[in-house]
Regions:
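A short acidic-Thr-Gly-centered motif at the start of a beta-strand
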Residues: 1, 44-48, 465-481, 713-718
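Entry/capping segment at the start of metal-dependent catalytic domains
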Residues: 1-15
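Conserved "right-hand" nucleotidyltransferase catalytic core of DNA-directed polymerases
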Residues: 7, 132-191, 204, 212-465, ...
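Active-site-proximal helix-loop-helix substrate-binding element of RNase H-like nuclease domains
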Residues: 12-16, 20, 24-279, 283, ...
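Conserved pre-motif C helix in the palm subdomain of viral-like polymerases
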Residues: 270-276, 689-712
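Active-site palm subdomain of RNA-directed nucleic acid polymerases
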Residues: 282-294, 703-733
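Function-dense linear segments that define catalytic or interfacial modules
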Residues: 441-536
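A common structural junction motif
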Residues: 585, 750-760
Length: 777
């Protein structure tokens, strides 16, 4: 077993130092650039062939650099030479190294990923907690009280300059950007670190004042190379004689830094020391879990990259540039966007252009507005929403008659969205063209549900599904043929397995589309067949697509508000649709209610407006495959907010000050209590949604990872030619494959899916062989 870490020139340049040790052996520092090439190659051979495997912290990063280094050095004709004496030659060979052999260790354990499966999941990025509209007179006292009542670990703020800075008092501005003097927001801004040293300080008890952090020993900014994660080689940035400050221009500085700076060398040695100690702290976990194996796979696959059609990408970029140039305004400016929308909005409609008490034209707002229609006042009830008997009007919804004619603001919102999408597309195409390949990079556990997430400046999961785009991604080259497919109705079959509703299962087995089933309730009185018939119609007329948006919102924990914004229907109709759905599929409704009940810590047994009581919530939710999403931190904060709202300090209640908060005149302490309760309920609601989301998304992540890992098992251990090169995007697995291995890959796919059928009865993958492009699947 080898404990491994590397130091590099920048984030994406070649390794400068390899630190390693056996289970009980002395820590070794191998200086790459001043050592004969053969010695480095021999070390890599030893690491790859170790019979137990490797243990590291963030192996996707380290293994990428081992592969990058090996494939560059192995091409050099004289292995007795030192790399530092042949910088230009090696920089030229580096690019070609992407087409070299595959490196795969015997086994692996990534302790960063292991930590993310337990309570240290809390070190992953998370949203701020806000207490909104607190009277200014009490704002700083409330912040101080929250600091005192909620003891939070420094690791949750490790990326801040001042880790002790927790709850902050923030100004609130009105629609004109002016500060509202009477109220403040109190915000808990997390800046957690899952870095090795931060975890070592918290788990192993090292003094944060004496532990060496990278910022303590790193070279100054002017010594860092020009680089990019999506084009991770020097020739993407420069050429011999003009390297444009990419790594060939600074490698000597980095070599000398890691060779002669004793503090830097101690820092590097500590990396292995802490990794080994964490291995023991976590109870010597077994090597070979799927996530750790995939971390090494992600690193080596990222370095190789995937084939793209450069001419096709150039054509797409030209079209996007032309579309952007044709836009009537500069939609890069939020002020321009807001003004453009307000021109066709009335005073009430303009209230939608805000987010968290600030003016905003963020995408989620524009997506909602893009669904607006030109509704008219109901002539039957004159806009009252009820008849003379007080009964709900059967001709309208809340006094308005819906239409399929887009609102003027809807058209403008969609135009702004199109502009932003075109801008993002151009950025993507520029990145791909710079590299000449698609260097897909992932965080193996990138979200709290364990899903993979894009990394290093290019998000593979953001690439459009459009055929014209995916035709430009042949993906396979160098003698490999593209295979791949995606899971059919993935989220739906997972929901069927998770909730186990026999009525829904019976409908799905007959081939009925869940989007059509739900669409009947979203767009009454339309029938199932009428919903399906709208598929492909323009704009809001496509009720099938809008129903599909509603289904995904439903699957991921959304209720009436989310359904309303995602589908573009009034909240009352969304609520009625949700209630009709869970009344028809009662087991679904009961199982969903169980999840919500697990995290419903604050309850009003006697109804809205009555006393709120506290019930201890669950600390985690578990997927059908056993991956836990922890809510320990959120529950801790929520409970303190509740307790403080229930029983604030007495001197707050004695303050004789009245304020008007959300159209209600309250005492200052009463307004504080309202703000605290609102924050606690918002946090609770977020937990409930995340829990409902988790049982679907985490299960999907486990399945796609399992299939990737099983395909990757076909790649030989050690250093060898490429046989398979898996890539996971959402519910798709694409895999350039050596021709003779295609039947073996197909067999693995079939065995994996059939093995999961007992847990996920409707699981199915539509797999194809010898595909021309990503669009062919």
């Amino acid at each position: 077993m080898i404990f491994l870490d590397v130091e590099t020139c920048g984030f994406h340049g070649p390794a400068t130092l390899i630190q390693w040790a056996t289970l009980d052996g002395e820590i070794q520092l191998h200086d790459v650039w001043c050592t004969p090439i053969q010695e480095t190659l021999d070390l890599i051979y030893m690491i790859v062939d170790d019979e137990e495997g490797i243990v590291g912290f963030n192996l996707a990063f380290d293994w990428f650099h081992i592969c990058q280094l090996y494939t560059m050095l192995v091409q050099f004709p004289d292995p007795n030479e030192r790399p530092i004496d042949h910088i230009d030659e090696l920089a030229i060979l580096e690019e070609q190294g992407r087409f070299g052999d595959c490196l795969k260790p015997v086994s692996a354990l990534d302790l960063m990923l292991h930590a993310r499966k337990g309570p240290y999941q809390g070190t992953m990025n998370r949203s701020d907690v806000k207490v909104k509209k607190v009277p200014t007179a009490l704002a700083w006292e409330v912040a101080k009280e929250l600091d005192a009542r909620i003891p939070l670990k420094d690791v949750y703020f490790a990326r801040k300059q001042d880790v002790k800075k927790r709850w902050q008092v923030m100004d609130i501005t009105d629609d004109f950007g002016d500060i509202i003097p009477d109220f403040k927001n109190i915000v808990l801004k997390f800046a957690p670190s899952s870095a090795l040293k931060a975890l070592a300080a918290d788990a192993l008890g090292y003094d944060t004042e004496t532990i060496r952090m990278f910022t303590d020993i790193e070279l100054p900014t002017q010594c860092q190379p020009t680089e990019s994660g999506y084009a991770p080689f020097a020739l993407a940035h420069g050429k011999p004689g003009d390297w444009n400050w990419s790594w060939p221009d600074v490698i000597r500085i980095h070599m000398e830094h890691w060779l002669f700076n004793e503090s830097a060398r101690k820092y590097a040695s500590d990396d292995v020391k802490y990794t080994r100690e964490l291995y023991h702290y976590f109870g010597k976990p077994a090597l070979g879990d799927n996530d750790s194996i995939l971390a090494c796979m992600v690193g080596t696959v990222r370095w190789r990259g995937f084939a793209i059609d450069v001419d096709g990408i150039l054509k797409l970029k030209k079209q996007a540039v032309e579309a952007l140039a044709a836009m009537p305004h500069n939609f890069n400016s939020p002020v321009v966007c807001r003004t453009y929308l307000e021109q066709v909005m009335d005073e009430t409609e303009r209230l939608n252009l805000s987010y968290q008490d600030r003016p905003s034209t963020r995408s989620i707002i524009l997506e909602d507005i893009a669904n607006w229609t030109e509704d008219t006042v109901c002539p039957e009830c004159k806009g009252m929403g009820e008849n003379d008997l007080g009964e709900e009007c059967s001709h309208c919804s809340g006094g308005l008659v819906k239409s399929d004619i887009p609102h003027k603001a809807a058209r403008r919102a969609q135009l702004i969205l199109d502009c932003r999408h075109a801008k993002k597309e151009i950025e993507l195409y520029d990145k791909l063209l710079k590299a000449g390949r698609f260097h897909a990079s992932f965080k193996v556990i990138g979200t709290l549900s364990s899903r993979m997430a894009g990394a290093d400046g290019l998000n593979p999961q953001g690439i459009k599904h459009a055929t014209t785009v995916r035709e430009c991604f042949p993906l396979a080259d160098c003698g490999l043929s593209l295979c791949g497919g995606d899971f059919a109705g993935f989220e739906v079959c997972l929901a069927d397995a998770v909730y186990g509703d026999p009525d829904l299962h019976a409908d799905l087995v007959t081939g009925k589309k869940i989007h059509g089933l739900f669409g009947q309730y979203l767009f009454p009185p339309m029938t199932y067949d009428e919903i399906l018939a709208t598929k492909g119609l323009p704009d809001n007329e496509d009720k099938y697509a809008r129903s599909k948006n509603g289904v995904f919102a439903l699957l991921y924990g959304g209720q009436e508000y989310t359904l309303s914004t995602r589908v573009g229907i009034p909240e009352e109709i969304a609520n009625e649709a949700y209630q009709r759905w869970i009344n028809k599929y009662k087991v679904w409704g009961k199982e969903r209610a169980k999840i919500f009940d697990m995290f419903c810590s604050m309850r009003q047994p006697s109804g809205i407006g009555t006393k709120v009581t506290w019930a201890e919530p669950s600390n985690f939710i578990e997927s059908m495959f056993g991956f836990k999403r922890y809510f320990t931190l959120e529950n801790q904060i929520c409970k303190v907010l509740f307790k403080l709202a229930e029983d604030p300090p007495k001197h707050w209640t004695r303050m004789h000050l009245k304020v008007t908060r959300r159209d209600r005149v309250q005492t200052a302490s009463g307004a504080v209590r309202s703000a605290l309760f609102a924050s606690a309920f918002a946090l609770q609601a977020a937990n409930m949604r995340a829990a409902a989301n988790h049982v679907i998304q985490s299960s999907g992540a486990t399945i796609t990872k399992l299939l990737q890992k099983n395909i990757w098992d076909l790649q030989p251990i050690g250093i060898s030619e490429w046989l398979v090169q898996p890539l996971n995007i959402h519910d798709e697995i694409m895999c350039p494959t050596k021709l003779e291995m295609i039947p073996e890959v197909r067999k693995i796919v079939d065995l994996t899916v059939s093995g999961l059928i007992p847990k996920v009865p409707l699981l199915e993958i539509e797999w194809g062989d010898k595909l021309e492009t990503w669009a062919s699947k």
